[in-house]
Amino acid sequence: MEAKRLLLLLLLCLYVVSSLVIASPQTCPADLSTKCADSGEWEGEFFPGIPTVKYEGPTSKNPLSFKWYNAQEEILGKKMKDWMRFSVAFWHTFRGSGADPFGSATKNWPWEDGTNSLAMAKRRMRANFEFIKKLGVDLWCFHDRDIAPDAETLEETNKNLDEVVALAKKLQGTKIHPLWGTAQLFLHPRYMHGAATSSEVGVYAYAAAQVKKAMEATHYLGGENYVFWGGREGYQTLLNTDMERELDHMARFLEAAVAYKKKIGFNGTLLIEPKPQEPTKHQYDWDAATSANFLRKYGLIDEFKLNIECNHATLSGHSCHHELETARISGLLGNIDANTGDPQVGWDTDQFLTDISEATMVMLSVVRNGGLAPGGFNFDAKLRRESTDVEDLFIAHISGMDTLARGLRNVAKLIEDGSLTDLVRKRYQSFDTEIGTKIEAGKADFEMLEKKAMEWGEPRVPSAKQELAEMIFQSAL
């Protein structure tokens, strides 16, 4: 009898313990010692111990706080959050593994199970929205194939995307939505010759079907923009390339996208993201000026704007500020992929921006543009391969947000001081004269200008005051 009582007591204890385990909230520990459950329906916490990130001011030593970005603070007539419109990039944040051409993955995130299953895609989506909410932003960006896996057929792949998009819609609620969506038209071997510029009509048609579906998903999720990045739209050698035909094909593809956008009632902005090379030797949307010329040639200039990525600017031999100004003065600045490159390497490193000087110049363009809405700042940036702690995801985004916030504060100083604006105004003040006004109005012919040149004699050419401009700029940093 004693043995039976002990057995019953043991069973009762096991029942109580198991009940407590079942009743307790699930969590996904932010360390490598524990993995999450396999179920795609798992709804526990992915970032336990990491609170919602708050503004604590520049004296704070807390790495999980904002020092310069204060979302509700008004600067130059707008709240900081409205100037910035920060967005999380799903691909770098939740698909970046740390792998590179010389090494395998280094980031063993605790929620990953090593598969590219639909269940895993749903779990990543849950992690994505917990991250977004704790970071305190309202926007995110995605490629179709990053959020949902490829299947054997296009129909099956579309079904996968539908399931994940339906979950994303539920998790978004009413506050969060995509800054932009796009189709991944570069990873699969079918796109090795390009997508819209492929030499194979079957690939062209497949790419069109993929963009059609991605545009529908973006629209359904309330996305404000749709991006075209032509990573394979270019060539490796001109010896086997009909450039004119490929450019015409790309234009027809974009025309079809414009038509479909209007057909489904998508009111968002279509964006082209320039990049000079990588993975192709030469991409057709080399830089902002090249992209603008393409749009003008094919009558698409009023249908698209540009998504400027700072690291792409440096690869094309320009500063980010140059590309932003080129886009802005053309009326084409629509969005910024906020990152930076390493000046000592020649490839796209996609680093988080931490240079205060560069951030200030970026924000000069944004303020001159009156903001970016309906665009914003997408953090197309990834952790370094050696950064492997879950909290590093937060630290990197916080640092990038604070850097751009400091840039905005510095621009406010420059505008309020007025010295730099005055220096530039004085440099061009000779064009504020009667003859200068006629030149700018297109009413001064060569005969008139020749007469003035003879009347005035040798012109006096004043100093450009570059060093003074640099001094004024640095004083605001």
Range-by-range predicted roles:
Residues 82-115, 182-198, 230-237:
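N-terminal small/glycine-rich loop or linker at the start of catalytic domains
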Residues 40, 125-127, 139, 149-306, ...:
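Active-site acidic/histidine proton-transfer and metal-coordination neighborhood
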Residues 2, 14-30:
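N-terminal signal peptide
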Residues 80-86, 116-146:
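Catalytic domains of carbohydrate-active enzymes, especially glycoside hydrolases
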Residues 99-123, 241-247, 281-292, 305, ...:
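Gly/Pro-rich active-site loop or hairpin
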Residues 88, 132, 207, 218, ...:
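Conserved, mostly hydrophobic/aromatic
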Residues 1-10:
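Classical eukaryotic N-terminal signal peptides for Sec-dependent ER targeting/secretion
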Residues 331, 350-477:
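Flexible, acidic glycine-rich loops studded with aromatic residues
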